[in-house]
C-alpha cells in the first residue's frame, strides 16, 4: 500500500485538453484546486531567470525614477514610491534568496509585489500565452487581460488582508514555501466582516 501511494504522489499532472476540460467543468470559479508535480511550460523559468527579470525591471524603474509595477509592504503598510525605489532587488543580491536575506535583515514582515515581470523580456511572453490559450479554449476569454506577477517576502498574512480576488489566480511556488488559508465561498458570504480583515482567529476553524 505504501509503495502504491508513493507512486501515485510522484505522478506528474499534465495540463492537456482532458485536464482543462475537467478543470473548467468542476473547478473554474467554483472551488480551489491543489496540484503537485505539474507539467507546464511556465515552470521552465528557473528561480535564477526570474531573479534576472526582476533585477532588469528594477533597474528600469531606478533609471526612470518610477517604481510603477512594484509594490512594497512592511507590516501590512504600503510604502510610498520613494521608499519602494530604495528596496528594489539589485544584481549584487545575486539571487531571490540573496534579496530575501537582505530584506529579512531589515524588515520582520515585508512583501514585494511585481506585476510586470514579463514586460522586460518578450521572449518569455509565450510561456504565459501558451498557458492561457489552453485555458481560454474551455472557459472563454477574460474581459480585461492576463498577467504574471511575483510575490516575495516573509509576511505572515497577505498585506491587504483576507480577500476575494476579482480574477482567476494560478499560483506556482518558485522558491521556498507558500501557504494559503482558504474559506468556502458560502462561509465568506455569510461573514462579510472577513473581507480585508487581519483579525480572523474566531474564523480559523472554518478555514
Describe each region flagged by the PLM:
Residues 28-30:
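Anionic coordination/interaction segments
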Residues 2-26, 40-47, 51-207:
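Active-site region of the double-stranded beta-helix
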Amino acid at each position: 500500500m505504501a509503495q502504491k501511494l508513493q507512486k501515485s504522489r510522484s505522478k506528474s499532472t499534465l495540463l492537456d485538453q482532458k485536464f482543462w476540460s475537467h478543470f473548467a467543468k468542476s473547478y473554474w470559479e467554483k472551488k480551489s484546486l491543489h496540484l503537485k508535480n505539474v507539467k507546464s511550460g511556465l515552470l521552465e523559468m528557473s528561480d535564477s531567470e526570474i531573479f534576472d527579470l526582476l533585477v532588469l525591471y528594477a533597474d528600469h524603474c531606478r533609471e526612470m525614477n518610477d517604481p510603477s509595477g512594484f509594490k512594497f509592504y512592511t507590516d501590512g503598510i504600503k510604502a510610498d514610491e520613494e521608499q519602494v525605489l530604495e528596496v528594489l532587488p539589485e544584481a549584487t543580491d545575486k539571487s531571490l534568496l540573496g534579496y530575501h536575506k537582505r530584506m529579512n535583515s531589515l524588515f520582520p514582515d515585508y512583501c514585494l509585489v511585481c506585476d510586470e515581470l514579463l514586460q522586460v523580456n518578450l521572449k518569455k511572453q509565450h510561456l504565459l500565452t501558451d498557458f492561457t490559450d489552453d485555458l481560454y479554449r474551455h472557459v472563454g476569454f477574460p474581459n480585461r487581460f492576463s498577467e504574471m506577477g511575483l510575490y516575495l517576502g516573509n509576511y505572515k498574512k497577505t498585506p491587504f488582508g483576507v480577500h476575494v480576488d476579482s480574477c482567476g489566480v494560478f499560483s506556482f511556488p518558485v522558491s521556498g514555501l507558500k501557504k494559503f488559508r482558504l474559506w468556502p465561498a458560502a462561509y465568506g458570504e455569510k461573514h462579510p466582516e472577513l473581507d480585508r480583515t487581519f483579525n480572523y482567529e474566531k474564523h480559523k476553524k472554518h478555514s
